[in-house]
Every structure is written in C-alpha cells, then in structure tokens.
Amino acid sequence: MNARGLSRCQRQLLEELGEQYCVNRIDGVKCIYRDFGDHDVEICGGRTIRAPFHIFVWQKKPHLEIVERFMDLPHDCKQVAVLLQQIAQRYDA
C-alpha cells in the first residue's frame, strides 16, 4: 500500500523512518506499520501538525494483545523515529 491517503505530516514521518516501514490499513484507517515477526508496531495519528502521534506495539502470538503503547507524542518526526529505533531493538526478531 502506498503513502496515498496519508497526510503530509504522516508522509514526512514515513520518509524519516525508511523502507522498513509501510502503510497498512488497520481498523479502516491508514497507519504506518512495521512487522517484527511475533510483534508489530502501528503508528497512527499525526494527521495535522498539531495532532499527536500514537504508537502501539502488538504481540501476535499466542494471541493478539497490545504490549506497549505511547500516546500523545509531540509531532516531532526525529523524536518519534528515535523512539521507534528503541522499540525495534526490543522486538525485531
């Protein structure tokens, strides 16, 4: 799925994150997504400069469950990218 339908702010974050992240439709909304194998990460929000980002880390096995959540993150792509690097270090298989 391409970045079409994302806001300018979300596209900017997707570009900052690089090719490991993609766009995925989750619950009818386009989000930025990365699959880590047994876990995945969903980044939503950020539709405008004032709108915060929200990050959810999902455990997929043995059942689907949110294991970490980061809510109301300021719209700072570099800061969000650093947090996602830390998350990747914990969950990337």
Positions of PLM-derived features:
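Short, conserved beta-strand/beta-arch hydrophobic-aromatic motifs that form part
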Residues: 40-58
